[in-house]
């Protein structure tokens, strides 16, 4: 990093800017080398100012939320990592709608909706991470996905804030089509009025299911691989005899085989090597190529 780069970024941001920030502090897997710059914008206009400088200088950048679905290599990230954790406002709108910013957690969103007597988002109960990340990967469970409920999406791309309505969104299984460099800022959800006790009952049911099936007990990024069409990744991994397989500090969970866990002292390289072993063994046994759901970034 140069003094000029540092000076320009500091001048552009009202929020916090850190230097050589270990990404292990900001990923659910607790691995990852240092980011050159780690920025925490105060609000969307602050992010716009920061992005204007980043784009002008042609710097690589990465937006993070709760650090789930993310693996940062041991060499870290050469550029600016941007945290949207300050973007956490939520509000009820007329006609059973709710607006939430990207830095709100999924659990805050579920609880806020319930508090407003709105139903539809209960299936997100227990899914870790933030709303921006859930939207970006079309997170879901129990046959539901979050983008099914989105009326509009607010994004920042090329320094311009844009609102895209449902009919113009392109999405699929664990995927939202975004333009290069487009950042999700907020969404408006179209929900339905419901009884608070019934909503709470569904929330508790989903939480209990997740506790029983996914309480893995160690740092993890959530599901590491996407489910191939008509198949379950965990079953393919289990059938390949990989339950409990361990490389360094990275292990295939004994509880849920699509969760790779940090048993302590793991490096990103351990997870990368373990992922390759899993893909090779599954391909060898079933002929199916697994695709990572976790995003892999950074340098070795």
From Swiss-Prot:
Reactions catalysed, as given in the entry: UDP-N-acetyl-alpha-D-muramate + NADP(+) = UDP-N-acetyl-3-O-(1-carboxyvinyl)-alpha-D-glucosamine + NADPH + H(+)
List the active site: 174, 223, 293
Cofactor names from the entry are:
FAD
Q: In which pathway does it act?
A: Cell wall biogenesis; peptidoglycan biosynthesis
Q: Under the GO molecular function aspect, what terms does this record hold?
A: FAD binding; UDP-N-acetylmuramate dehydrogenase activity
Q: Which UniProt keywords apply?
A: Cell cycle, Cell division, Cell shape, Cell wall biogenesis/degradation, Cytoplasm, FAD, Flavoprotein, NADP, Oxidoreductase, Peptidoglycan synthesis
Q: What class of enzyme is it?
A: oxidoreductase
The entry's localization annotation reads:
Cytoplasm
Pfam families with a match to the protein in the record: FAD_binding_4 (PF01565), MurB_C (PF02873)
Cite the EC number. 1.3.1.98
User: FAD-binding PCMH-type domain: from which residue to which, for each copy?
Assistant: 30-194
Per the record, its GO cellular-component terms are:
cytosol
Q: Which GO terms describe its biological process?
A: cell division; cell wall organization; peptidoglycan biosynthetic process; regulation of cell shape
Task: State its role.
Answer: Cell wall formation.
Q: Which family is this protein grouped under?
A: Belongs to the MurB family.
Q: What is this protein called?
A: UDP-N-acetylenolpyruvoylglucosamine reductase
Q: Which organism is it from?
A: Geotalea uraniireducens (strain Rf4)
